[in-house]
């Protein structure tokens, strides 16, 4: 079995049924494999659109979003949405065609160090340059995209590797791992702090803005009798959707942050914005 077919079979075993793509050169063998595996391809007119659509698909379906582009300018056009997916905490896998391994360093068509470009914008980026690395790297890319605080990952797929036969027979694989989102029981210190707090505030990150979390967050507010604020706007506390919260946060005596950096949107947790005596717990 060719590596291209095995890759698509892995994606299908992980629940992928749709890929957003712009065709070209090195990835055409993956288009053929998608047709064989009955995976829907939604073709776009620009590579950035493929990644943005994969991000939206992931947020609406609770699945990983997959985008597929070709090498060179194709990969470069797909860069900006990786930053967006990082900020929105959305599990996206970007697959890009790449030049042949056997021609590395010879100035082959669209040769470039893709990983060096994408590594700063993804949770995991790797070039598959040997068939033996195909299965573990694909599974790792999916795991990293979903695990902990979700985000984008990237695999550069060398054209000659995609057309190479696997050395060992392929068997359907499905990952079985405990997600880092399976948070451990709250610490005794947190429980004690929450019990004594008079005005607690819970802040959650963009990941919790996905539609299926809306009711869960309302239930959490009711059960804890504490406001739960989902923050995804770069406006932070100035987001009109949050009403007059900016004038109230300096009254809070306990702040619990889940899945969100204490960044500029939270005024860096400064004493000018928050109660200087407030106790903080952050699960980032």
Spans of features found by a protein language model:
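N-terminal alpha/beta PP-like core and its mobile active-site loop of ThDP/TPP-dependent enzymes
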Residues: 1-284
């Amino acid at each position: 079995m060719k590596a291209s077919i095995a890759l698509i079979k892995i994606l299908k075993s992980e629940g992928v049924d749709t890929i957003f793509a712009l065709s070209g050169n090195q990835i055409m063998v993956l288009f053929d494999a998608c047709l064989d595996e009955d995976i829907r391809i939604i073709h776009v007119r620009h590579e950035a659109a493929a990644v943005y659509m994969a991000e939206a698909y992931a947020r609406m379906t609770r699945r990983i979003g997959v985008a597929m582009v070709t090498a060179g300018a194709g990969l470069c056009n797909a860069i900006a949405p990786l930053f967006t997916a990082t900020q929105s905490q959305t599990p996206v896998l970007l697959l890009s065609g790449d030049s042949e391994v056997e021609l590395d360093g010879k100035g082959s068509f669209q040769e470039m160090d893709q990983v060096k470009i994408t590594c700063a914008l993804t949770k995991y980026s790797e070039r598959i340059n040997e068939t033996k690395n195909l299965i573990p790297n694909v599974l790792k890319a999916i795991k990293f995209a979903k695990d902990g605080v979700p985000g984008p990952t990237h695999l550069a797929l060398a054209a000659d590797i995609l057309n190479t036969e696997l050395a060992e027979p392929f068997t359907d694989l499905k990952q079985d791992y405990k997600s880092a989102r399976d948070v451990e029981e709250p610490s005794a210190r947190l429980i004690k702090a929450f019990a004594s707090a008079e005005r607690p505030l819970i802040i959650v990150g963009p990941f919790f803005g996905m539609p299926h979390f809306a009711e869960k967050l309302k239930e959490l507010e009711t059960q804890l009798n504490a406001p739960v604020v989902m923050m995804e706007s770069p406006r932070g506390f100035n987001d009109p959707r949050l009403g007059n919260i900016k004038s109230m946060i300096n009254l809070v005596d306990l702040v619990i942050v889940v899945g969100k950096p204490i960044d500029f949107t939270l005024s860096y947790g400064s004493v000018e914005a928050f109660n200087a005596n407030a106790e903080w717990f952050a699960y980032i």
